Regions:
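OB-fold/S1-family single-stranded nucleic acid-binding modules
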Residues: 55-58, 63-133, 148, 153-176, ...
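N-terminal ordered "arm"
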Residues: 1-58, 62
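Exposed beta-sheet edge/beta-hairpin loop segments within beta-rich domains
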Residues: 53, 141-144, 180-181
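Short amphipathic beta-strand and strand-loop transition segments with alternating hydrophobic
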Residues: 6-11, 131-146, 192-196
Protein backbone atom coordinates (compact mmCIF):
# COMPACT_ATOMS: atom_id res chain seq x y z
CA UNK A 1 0.00 0.00 0.00
CA UNK A 2 1.42 3.40 -0.99
CA UNK A 3 2.04 5.34 2.23
CA UNK A 4 3.42 8.86 2.56
CA UNK A 5 5.54 9.18 5.70
CA UNK A 6 7.23 12.07 7.47
CA UNK A 7 10.51 10.49 8.55
CA UNK A 8 11.08 11.12 12.27
CA UNK A 9 13.65 8.43 13.07
CA UNK A 10 16.65 6.84 11.36
CA UNK A 11 18.29 5.04 14.24
CA UNK A 12 20.70 2.21 15.00
CA UNK A 13 19.28 -1.30 15.27
CA UNK A 14 21.16 -4.61 15.15
CA UNK A 15 23.89 -3.22 12.89
CA UNK A 16 21.31 -1.74 10.52
CA UNK A 17 18.61 0.87 10.98
CA UNK A 18 15.14 1.39 12.36
CA UNK A 19 13.08 3.87 10.36
CA UNK A 20 9.89 5.41 11.73
CA UNK A 21 7.58 8.30 11.07
CA UNK A 22 4.05 9.60 10.70
CA UNK A 23 1.63 8.43 8.01
CA UNK A 24 0.38 11.82 6.77
CA UNK A 25 -2.98 10.38 5.68
CA UNK A 26 -3.90 8.93 9.08
CA UNK A 27 -1.67 10.95 11.42
CA UNK A 28 -0.53 7.66 12.97
CA UNK A 29 2.98 6.36 13.57
CA UNK A 30 4.38 3.67 11.29
CA UNK A 31 7.57 1.64 11.67
CA UNK A 32 8.61 -0.12 8.43
CA UNK A 33 9.84 -3.64 9.23
CA UNK A 34 11.94 -5.81 6.93
CA UNK A 35 10.76 -9.31 6.06
CA UNK A 36 14.38 -10.33 5.42
CA UNK A 37 16.17 -9.70 8.73
CA UNK A 38 15.98 -11.47 12.08
CA UNK A 39 14.56 -8.61 14.15
CA UNK A 40 12.96 -6.43 11.50
CA UNK A 41 15.91 -4.07 11.12
CA UNK A 42 15.91 -2.35 7.72
CA UNK A 43 19.00 -2.84 5.49
CA UNK A 44 20.22 -0.05 3.22
CA UNK A 45 18.90 -1.73 0.08
CA UNK A 46 15.36 -1.42 1.47
CA UNK A 47 15.56 1.98 3.17
CA UNK A 48 17.64 3.94 0.65
CA UNK A 49 16.07 6.88 -1.16
CA UNK A 50 17.83 7.43 -4.50
CA UNK A 51 20.98 5.94 -2.96
CA UNK A 52 20.87 8.13 0.15
CA UNK A 53 19.89 7.61 3.78
CA UNK A 54 16.42 8.86 4.74
CA UNK A 55 16.73 12.15 6.62
CA UNK A 56 14.54 13.42 9.42
CA UNK A 57 11.63 15.50 8.08
CA UNK A 58 11.88 13.92 4.61
CA UNK A 59 8.50 13.18 3.02
CA UNK A 60 8.86 9.66 1.63
CA UNK A 61 6.45 7.49 -0.33
CA UNK A 62 6.81 3.91 0.92
CA UNK A 63 5.16 0.65 -0.10
CA UNK A 64 3.96 -0.84 3.20
CA UNK A 65 1.65 -3.71 4.03
CA UNK A 66 -1.44 -3.19 6.17
CA UNK A 67 0.02 -5.27 8.99
CA UNK A 68 3.29 -6.16 10.69
CA UNK A 69 4.71 -8.14 13.61
CA UNK A 70 3.19 -7.37 17.02
CA UNK A 71 4.61 -10.08 19.32
CA UNK A 72 6.70 -9.96 22.49
CA UNK A 73 9.96 -9.64 20.55
CA UNK A 74 8.61 -6.38 19.11
CA UNK A 75 7.31 -5.15 22.50
CA UNK A 76 3.73 -5.71 21.23
CA UNK A 77 4.03 -2.61 19.03
CA UNK A 78 1.00 -1.39 17.08
CA UNK A 79 3.04 0.65 14.56
CA UNK A 80 4.93 -2.09 12.72
CA UNK A 81 4.26 -2.52 9.00
CA UNK A 82 5.98 -5.00 6.67
CA UNK A 83 7.95 -3.42 3.85
CA UNK A 84 6.73 -4.34 0.36
CA UNK A 85 9.11 -4.33 -2.64
CA UNK A 86 8.68 -0.92 -4.32
CA UNK A 87 11.58 1.53 -3.80
CA UNK A 88 11.08 4.49 -1.51
CA UNK A 89 10.74 7.90 -3.15
CA UNK A 90 11.35 11.31 -1.55
CA UNK A 91 9.19 14.13 -2.86
CA UNK A 92 9.73 16.92 -0.36
CA UNK A 93 10.33 17.78 3.27
CA UNK A 94 8.19 18.78 6.21
CA UNK A 95 8.94 21.70 8.52
CA UNK A 96 9.11 21.78 12.30
CA UNK A 97 5.77 23.57 12.28
CA UNK A 98 4.28 20.62 10.37
CA UNK A 99 5.19 18.08 13.05
CA UNK A 100 3.91 19.96 16.09
CA UNK A 101 0.41 18.57 15.56
CA UNK A 102 1.78 15.09 16.28
CA UNK A 103 3.23 15.91 19.72
CA UNK A 104 2.30 13.64 22.61
CA UNK A 105 1.43 15.30 25.92
CA UNK A 106 0.38 12.47 28.25
CA UNK A 107 1.76 12.47 31.80
CA UNK A 108 3.74 9.31 31.01
CA UNK A 109 6.15 8.67 28.15
CA UNK A 110 5.50 5.32 26.48
CA UNK A 111 3.49 3.81 29.34
CA UNK A 112 5.72 4.73 32.30
CA UNK A 113 7.75 7.50 33.93
CA UNK A 114 10.92 5.40 34.10
CA UNK A 115 13.34 4.67 31.28
CA UNK A 116 11.88 1.24 30.56
CA UNK A 117 8.53 -0.54 30.44
CA UNK A 118 7.59 -4.18 30.92
CA UNK A 119 6.16 -5.67 27.70
CA UNK A 120 3.25 -7.13 29.68
CA UNK A 121 2.05 -3.60 30.48
CA UNK A 122 1.73 -2.94 26.75
CA UNK A 123 0.28 -6.35 25.91
CA UNK A 124 -2.54 -5.82 28.44
CA UNK A 125 -3.80 -2.80 26.49
CA UNK A 126 -5.99 -2.80 23.37
CA UNK A 127 -3.92 -2.82 20.16
CA UNK A 128 -4.87 0.81 19.46
CA UNK A 129 -3.10 1.87 22.69
CA UNK A 130 0.09 -0.19 22.27
CA UNK A 131 2.27 2.76 21.33
CA UNK A 132 6.02 2.25 21.10
CA UNK A 133 6.81 5.61 19.47
CA UNK A 134 6.18 9.17 20.61
CA UNK A 135 7.17 12.68 19.59
CA UNK A 136 7.87 15.04 22.49
CA UNK A 137 8.80 18.69 22.71
CA UNK A 138 11.97 19.02 24.80
CA UNK A 139 12.95 22.12 26.74
CA UNK A 140 16.31 20.77 27.95
CA UNK A 141 18.57 18.05 26.56
CA UNK A 142 21.86 16.85 28.02
CA UNK A 143 24.11 14.33 26.29
CA UNK A 144 27.10 12.48 27.69
CA UNK A 145 29.20 9.43 26.95
CA UNK A 146 29.03 6.45 29.27
CA UNK A 147 30.71 3.14 28.55
CA UNK A 148 31.50 4.24 25.00
CA UNK A 149 27.85 5.05 24.23
CA UNK A 150 25.93 8.29 24.17
CA UNK A 151 23.23 8.76 26.80
CA UNK A 152 20.54 11.42 26.94
CA UNK A 153 18.78 13.11 29.82
CA UNK A 154 15.85 15.26 28.78
CA UNK A 155 13.01 17.30 30.19
CA UNK A 156 9.81 17.71 28.19
CA UNK A 157 7.67 20.84 28.12
CA UNK A 158 5.23 18.98 30.41
CA UNK A 159 8.00 18.65 33.01
CA UNK A 160 8.66 14.92 32.55
CA UNK A 161 12.28 13.86 33.03
CA UNK A 162 13.94 10.90 31.32
CA UNK A 163 17.46 10.16 32.53
CA UNK A 164 20.24 8.13 30.97
CA UNK A 165 18.42 6.77 27.93
CA UNK A 166 20.45 5.48 24.99
CA UNK A 167 20.90 7.67 21.93
CA UNK A 168 20.30 5.73 18.70
CA UNK A 169 19.75 8.62 16.25
CA UNK A 170 22.54 7.94 13.75
CA UNK A 171 22.97 11.54 12.57
CA UNK A 172 23.09 12.89 16.13
CA UNK A 173 25.69 10.26 17.09
CA UNK A 174 27.85 11.31 14.12
CA UNK A 175 27.60 14.94 15.22
CA UNK A 176 28.50 14.12 18.81
CA UNK A 177 31.44 11.94 17.79
CA UNK A 178 32.64 14.80 15.59
CA UNK A 179 32.56 17.24 18.48
CA UNK A 180 29.81 19.36 16.97
CA UNK A 181 27.61 21.55 19.13
CA UNK A 182 23.98 20.56 19.40
CA UNK A 183 20.89 22.62 20.16
CA UNK A 184 19.44 21.69 23.55
CA UNK A 185 15.81 22.43 22.72
CA UNK A 186 13.77 20.68 20.07
CA UNK A 187 11.73 17.60 19.34
CA UNK A 188 12.57 14.05 20.38
CA UNK A 189 11.35 10.87 18.77
CA UNK A 190 11.25 8.35 21.59
CA UNK A 191 11.05 4.64 20.84
CA UNK A 192 11.04 1.37 22.74
CA UNK A 193 13.78 -1.18 22.14
CA UNK A 194 13.21 -4.86 21.58
CA UNK A 195 12.93 -6.38 25.08
CA UNK A 196 16.18 -7.35 26.76
CA UNK A 197 17.37 -8.02 30.29
CA UNK A 198 20.34 -6.07 31.67
CA UNK A 199 23.22 -8.08 33.20
CA UNK A 200 22.57 -6.88 36.75
CA UNK A 201 22.61 -9.23 39.75
CA UNK A 202 19.63 -7.64 41.46
CA UNK A 203 17.50 -7.29 38.31
CA UNK A 204 14.28 -9.30 38.67
CA UNK A 205 11.92 -7.82 36.07
CA UNK A 206 13.00 -9.95 33.13
CA UNK A 207 13.38 -8.53 29.62
CA UNK A 208 11.95 -5.01 29.25
CA UNK A 209 11.61 -2.43 26.50
CA UNK A 210 14.10 0.41 26.99
CA UNK A 211 13.32 3.96 25.93
CA UNK A 212 15.59 5.33 23.22
CA UNK A 213 16.28 8.75 21.75
CA UNK A 214 15.70 7.57 18.18
CA UNK A 215 15.41 10.97 16.53
CA UNK A 216 16.39 14.54 17.42
CA UNK A 217 15.05 17.56 15.54
CA UNK A 218 16.49 20.87 16.79
CA UNK A 219 13.96 23.64 17.37
CA UNK A 220 15.57 25.77 14.65
CA UNK A 221 15.30 23.11 11.88
Amino acid sequence: METTVICLANSKKEGERCIAGIDVRTGQWVRPVSRHTSKGEVPFRERQVAGQEPQLLDLIVMDLAHEGPTGFEYCHAKENRWIDPSPWIKFGAASVADIRRYLACDNQILHSRSKYVCPGVIEAKPLSLRSTLELREVRALQLEQAGGKWKATLTTTEGIDLRGISVTDCHLIEQLNGGWEFLKTGYATLSLSIPWEPPMQDWDEGPVGWKLLAGWIPAQS
